[in-house]
Amino acid sequence: MKVNGVEVEETFAEAFDIKIARVLITGYDYYWAWVAANEATGFGTSVIMCPAEAGIEIKAKPSETPDGRPGYYIQICHMSKKGLEEQLLARLGQCVLTAPTTAVFNGLPDAEEKFDTGFKLKFFADGYEKEVEVGGRKCWAVPMMEGDFIIENDIGYTNGIAGGNFFIMAETQPSALAAAKAAVDAISDVEGVITPFPGGIVASGSKVGANKYKFLKASTNEKFAPSIRDQVEGTQIPEGVKAVYEIVINGLNADAIKEATRVGILAATKIPGVVKITAGNYGGKLGKHIINLNELF
């Protein structure tokens, strides 16, 4: 199959279950909302070594937020309920409570499952906290140096999906990078998904476990490493490909990940020098969710 003249391999991405909390952070303007969102989602690329996977999802217009201010939705992802609650409390407490002009609201108001994160963080007020209503939501006002920090009592979470992916293969590193950035930019407009790696792009595509070093949880995916193409039996690098980037997508549901994959591939294949698009799957070792690339177009 070809998209914009570029071969898209008839294969699938293999994704896995994860729990996702969705948070709305608002601020005085988009800059300060972004600062807090960016801090709160740091060190969140992969559960292989990070305490959570996290990323900025999408902008929120002032007309869409409980306090009428601009904001960003973020997602924090963890394999366990306990771990997710701990990460939510730590990241909101250390990275958003501390940031200028921010407020925090539940990004999944209809979720059946919630954490009382706002209730817990209100104790920072040391007895001066006050229950308030903002946009019809139960919140807490925490007096601080700049004024009151507002946080909603509950933050919702859901069973989501992590590890949706596709690979961009190109003739040069600059063309691969330009295509990957174009893909991430397109995906940033899709509601319900994040691309948790640096700039949304994975340079170090990995496989589950390792062939030589058995103590590793993950190791380089040598079949996708152009510099050792001639040394690797079963290499997946076509002739003429000098660089590969992977886009990893987490989302609230499969439909959101599929749409993000679709628009990402459409954007990437418009960049000159892109040779092929494929995806990563691991023989069922990683997860049960299958995203067939050929079904997206």
UniProtKB/Swiss-Prot annotation:
Q: Which Pfam families is this protein grouped with?
A: FTR, FTR_C
- Compartments (UniProt record): Cytoplasm
Q: Identify the EC number(s).
A: 2.3.1.101
Protein transport found in the keyword field: no
Subunit and interaction comment:
Homotetramer.
Q: In which organism is this protein found? A: Archaeoglobus fulgidus (strain ATCC 49558 / DSM 4304 / JCM 9628 / NBRC 100126 / VC-16)
Taxonomic superkingdom: Archaea
Name the Gene3D superfamilies on file: 3.30.70.520
Single GO molecular function: formylmethanofuran-tetrahydromethanopterin N-formyltransferase activity
Catalytic class of the enzyme: transferase
Q: Which family does it belong to?
A: Belongs to the FTR family.
Which pathway does it serve? Metabolic intermediate metabolism; lactate oxidation
Function text = Catalyzes the transfer of a formyl group from 5-formyl tetrahydromethanopterin (5-formyl-H(4)MPT) to methanofuran (MFR) to produce formylmethanofuran (formyl-MFR) and tetrahydromethanopterin (H(4)MPT).
Q: What is its main location?
A: cytoplasm
Which reactions is this enzyme annotated as catalysing?
A: N-formylmethanofuran + 5,6,7,8-tetrahydromethanopterin + H(+) = N(5)-formyl-5,6,7,8-tetrahydromethanopterin + methanofuran
Q: Which controlled-vocabulary keywords does the entry list?
A: Acyltransferase, Cytoplasm, One-carbon metabolism, Transferase
Q: Give the protein's recorded name.
A: Formylmethanofuran--tetrahydromethanopterin formyltransferase
SUPFAM superfamilies with a match to the protein in the record: Formylmethanofuran:tetrahydromethanopterin formyltransferase
UniProt entry tagged with the keyword Cytoplasm: yes
